[in-house]
Curated annotation (Swiss-Prot):
Gene3D superfamilies: S-adenosylmethionine decarboxylase
E.C. code: 4.1.1.50
Protein name from the UniProt record: S-adenosylmethionine decarboxylase proenzyme
Family indicated by similarity: Belongs to the prokaryotic AdoMetDC family. Type 1 subfamily.
Entry's cofactor comment: Binds 1 pyruvoyl group covalently per subunit.
Gene name for this UniProt entry: speH
Transmembrane segments: none
Pfam family membership, one: AdoMet_dc
Pathway(s) annotated for this protein in UniProt: Amine and polyamine biosynthesis; S-adenosylmethioninamine biosynthesis; S-adenosylmethioninamine from S-adenosyl-L-methionine: step 1/1
Amino acid sequence: MAKTLGLHIIADLYGVNPDLIDREEDIRHLLENSVKAGELTKISSHFYQFNPHGATGVILLAESHISIHTWPEHKTATVDVFTCGDPSKAYRAMDYIINSLSPTHVDKKVFDRGIIEDSKGKDVLWIMSKAGCC
């Protein structure tokens, strides 16, 4: 099994109650609580309220980041959770967001990021460079 530097979960949430994703303060509260649920370490954050509706926000983590972008007029939110270290933290943070917003449909993808070793402990980048592909 490959060793990776991090886990990246992206999700498109459809059928979200627009009242839950329209205001900056609501998504701020949502992301702050997802950091707690994932037992992650917040470094800083930035949120922005769009006019007439919708908001966006990002929390910079010691482990990487969590972000959300909302379109209440389409009942849609896109969420991004990327962490290094314990992958269960990313899953817990994302699960908190999904459970809090109760979408009718979720399109979620999970990516291993920064593959650094193969199952035998060999450096993948070294192997790829010797093969002439990097």
